[in-house]
């Protein structure tokens, strides 16, 4: 299957990436971030939750940093599993993620920011349309959760990433950057009990 057309932006710095994303937000334009693309691109091929604009992090050198205190968003899972700087439990978790080929492309940032999913939502749009929409699709209908119907207020799409539980056990912090500056926060505060929102 082919991906739908989208505009690809390749900033060279974090500041440039923030500026591009800020412009999209100001103009009410939808966009996605892409790191390794091992989850996003297959979803795009299936026409799942596609956006007209995609911002790639691949050209931002500082996101590849890996040492005993820092793991950049663009660090490949393969490199994390084989680094002398990685904590043994992180190495073990990283080497168990997916297949060798996916670990060669998949990134720490992409794994942590993985979208939530459920059996209903992760189907082709035609399949979903044949039944009805859901909370996560939010198509301005009074949709209901298809996994637990008739409760009409909670989305139970679950978080599927492999690396976050290990980082949570180690009390990891995440560094976030945006138009209003940067901040550090415990990784445990990054995740919300809401299947609709993407972390």
PLM ranges: what are they?
Residues 1-199:
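C-terminal structural segment of proteins
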